[in-house]
Amino acid sequence: MNVYRCPVCGYLQLGEKDFHFCPVCKTPAESFYRDPTMERSANWDTKSRMMIQHMAKTGHYFLEGKGTTRQFLNMDDLLFMPGQIATPPLLDDIPVKAEVVLGKNSPQAILLKTPILNAGMSFGALSREAKIALAKASRMVGGIANTGEGGMLDEEREFAEKITLQYASGRFGADESRLTQADMIEIKISQGAKPGMGGKLPGKKVTEEIARIRQIPSGKMAESPSRHKDIETPEDLSKKIAWLREITGGKPISLKFVGGHLEKDLDAIFSQANIPDVLVIDGGEGGTGAAPVFTKDHVGLPLVYSLPTVADYLRKNGLREKVTLIATGGIRHSGDVAKAIALGAEAVYMAGALKIAMGCKYIRECHLGTCPYGIATQDTRLRKRLDVENAAQRIANFIRAATDEVKTIARICGKNDIHKLNKDDLRAINSELARVTGVETASGGVE
């Protein structure tokens, strides 16, 4: 079997060169070269050997930035069925709605102009400049910024019209005064890159400013536990939701979790007196500033398996009018956004795509703090390389263009609202994908 190597990130493609881009760093397939040395030992790829050598030398697991490099089943083999005769496409001048409501029954509901929202990326993992650019871009497009688990920068609150404060297990910068400044609170149970694990920010990255925002000592490692210590039962979660609603005056409360024992987890969440206004399902493809490769590659369900299950649960239990569903984890472009919506999401979180829009070249050095583009670093010399205004404009341009593309897909399908897209508008050209999503195959029927 032939093995082709990406010259940029080292990804190995087994088989023929029947693809267009590297699934990891998006290098064109034409740049891949055949690697005969790997053809003799395809199972022992460079990354596996490198991880073994690292573990043997240090006695610790191998950390890496971004998401998994594994190729999980994704939405690429779902295709939209264009309207033709029976259901014609809409004319170009017919407007298509794309607004999203967070907190449908909340006294402080949030109306957004785009379904493409900022995922949680913390100050510490990202530079101050990157965080400000994301906040400014969210205002430009009528979206909502997200603090991530590292607390809220004053400038984030200043420049973002709407902002979500992430309430994670470390509770960094999440005292009552900050909670009341946010427009939505997101209880982070877990994330796709490292579900069931806490986080560690090395002491050398805990600058005085980061320490002030996170409300921790400077120069010392910032650690968050594997779970919320005061949320041990579904009842505890219900009480936490009620408390957060009370202190914020009824602002929307979001809950973020990863695909695992989905039905049991959903029953545990929605059998309680207090339920979230927004539910975020994160796929195992989700990226992060630093995570062990073994969790990224082997723990947590990919989004395409989780999203349809969660969406069907909400529909069957009459929760669609109460809960807004957000999908995240490896969402790359408008095709992914539109397909996620057709599978039941009302909005998506993007992280990697927004960093690429502002200048990230995906070299996977996020965890080292040496990002040469000034995005995932606290090095003052490197941070100067990121032009905040230009980065904000580029992010906004991308979100606007991608939102327009999603609207166009809806128009092609004869829909005047992106939220009218559904499984009937899709066909699968992969039988496994048809089976897990409930979408008909292109040849007819659900596998």
Task: State the predicted function of each range.
Residues 2, 18, 367:
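Short metal-coordination and nucleic-acid-contact micro-motifs, chiefly zinc-binding Cys/His arrays
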Residues 5, 21, 370:
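The −1 position to Zn-ligating cysteines in a subset of zinc-ribbon hairpins
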Residues 10, 34-87, 298, 309-322, ...:
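Alpha/beta catalytic cores of nucleotide-metabolism and tRNA/nucleoside-modifying enzymes
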Residues 14-21:
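Short linker/helix segments within small regulatory modules
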Residues 25-34:
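Short Cys/His-rich micro-motifs in 6-15 aa windows
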Residues 33-116, 120-139, 143-144, 151-152, ...:
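Conserved, well-structured core domains of diverse proteins
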Residues 112-117, 195, 213-226, 246-249, ...:
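Gly-rich Lys/Arg/Thr-decorated short loops/hinges at beta-loop-alpha junctions or inter-strand turns
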Residues 228-383:
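Glycine-rich phosphate/ribose-binding loops and adjacent secondary-structure elements
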